[in-house]
Structure formats: structure tokens, C-alpha cells
From Swiss-Prot:
Signal peptide: none annotated. It comes from Tolumonas auensis (strain DSM 9187 / NBRC 110442 / TA 4). The gene is ung. PROSITE patterns: U_DNA_GLYCOSYLASE (PS00130). This is Uracil-DNA glycosylase. Its EC number is 3.2.2.27. The active site is at residue 61.
Length: 223
């Protein structure tokens, strides 16, 4: 059974990856606040092993406010206000999935544990500065992640919301995988087709058709 180490081990030895890690370390050492904390940068891979991935949701870069980002796209830690994009994701789930109750928090760990890879395409950001690390090499790394999933797995469901994610997904083999596209759930664009897209029920239909366990999208209350 292949692991992330098997498919990305060589990638992490590449010069560009070392340069990205050096850049982020220097930013932190210079006193800049970088999100998420160093221990959380690779959480998407920690919580969803390569062989367990069923669904891929692509984000852009991490939330850049205090205490928000923790390495899973769109997710925030318990106790942090649910960000606007995730509010819209919950609205669509409530519309799309019978019985879905809108949670009071935005902690999406249970999705990751069921095989939903919550992957930002840029894995770090400077506090208060959206896209500040966009050209630091992360994009190349996450391209390789998507390429590895495309090549070594079959029947994955990719949810590509917004132009950035759709551009990243242009090399996914549509014969091997399912690709669902919609506008970004941000308040700026959700009304253009994200709300009403039905991606969550469609995802579960694809999984069920392939004799895979569907995702339980309901987020349980924090005890």
C-alpha cells in the first residue's frame, strides 16, 4: 500500500522544495508571523494517508488571520469563528444533503479522517497578507501531489472550486477520475453557481457506484 513517503519522498529532496522550506524558515526567523504553525503545515497529509484518499478538495492559500489556519483547507480549529467561505459550504451541504445540520464550528477533521484530502495549493502565508507565499515554490510541490494522485490512484473525486483550483486540476485524467467544478464558495462568487452545485451528493453517488463507503459530511458538535 503506497504512502505519501513513497510517492513524494524524492520530491522533498529536490532543490526547489529545500528552497521553499528555507524561505519559510527565514520568514519565521525574521520575526514575521507565518500561518499555519510549523507543526501544522503538512497536516493534510498527516490526517489523510495517500492510499486512503477518496476525495480531493483544493483550496488556495491558508487563512491569514490569527488562530485560523491549521493545515486543512477551509477548516478552522474549534473555538474560531466559521469563515465566510465555509459558511457557504455549509449552506450548500444543508441544501444538498438530506438531514445535514449546520455545525456551530468549522473543524473539518472528520472529513480528512474519512479520506477527504483538504489540500491548499500554497501551504503557508504571512499574517494578514493573502497570497504572500504564492511564488515561494509551494505551487510546484502541490502540482506534484496532484500528479501523484492522478497517476497512482483511480476513481478519485476532485472538487475544483474557483479558477485557481480549476487551473490546478487541468491535468487530471478525466478517464480515470471524476472532476466536479463550480465557482469558489467565497461570498464574492458563491451565488454564481457554487450554491446549488450539488457536489456533495454527486461525490457520494460516485463513491457508492464504485462500491466505496460514501462520506458522512455531517460535522459532529465539539464535545
Amino acid at each position: 500500500m503506497q504512502t505519501w513517503s513513497d510517492v513524494l519522498g524524492q520530491e522533498k529532496k529536490q532543490a526547489y522544495f529545500q528552497e521553499t522550506m528555507d524561505f519559510v524558515r527565514r520568514e519565521r526567523e525574521a520575526g514575521k508571523i507565518v500561518y499555519p504553525p510549523a507543526a501544522d503545515v503538512f497536516n493534510a497529509f498527516k490526517y489523510t494517508e495517500f492510499a486512503d484518499v477518496k476525495v480531493v478538495i483544493l483550496g488556495q492559500d491558508p487563512y491569514h488571520g490569527p488562530n485560523q489556519a491549521h493545515g486543512l483547507c477551509f477548516s478552522v480549529l474549534p473555538g474560531v469563528a466559521v469563515p465566510p467561505s465555509l459558511v457557504n459550504i455549509y449552506k450548500e451541504l444543508h441544501r444538498d444533503i438530506p438531514g445535514f445540520e449546520i455545525p456551530s464550528h468549522g473543524y473539518l477533521l472528520s472529513w480528512a479522517q474519512q479520506g477527504v484530502l483538504l489540500l491548499n495549493t500554497v501551504l503557508t502565508v504571512e499574517a494578514g497578507k493573502a497570497h504572500s507565499h504564492a511564488s515561494s515554490g509551494w505551487e510546484h510541490f502541490t502540482d506534484r501531489v496532484i500528479a501523484a494522485l492522478n497517476e497512482h490512484r483511480e476513481g478519485l473525486v476532485f472538487l475544483l472550486w474557483g479558477n485557481h483550483a480549476q487551473k490546478k486540476g487541468q491535468y487530471i485524467d478525466r478517464q480515470r477520475h471524476h472532476v466536479l467544478m463550480a465557482p469558489h464558495p467565497s461570498p464574492l462568487s458563491a451565488h454564481r453557481g457554487f450554491l446549488g452545485c450539488g457536489h456533495f451528493s454527486q461525490t457520494n453517488q460516485f463513491l457508492t457506484d464504485a462500491d466505496k463507503q460514501p462520506i458522512n459530511w455531517q460535522i459532529a458538535p465539539i464535545a
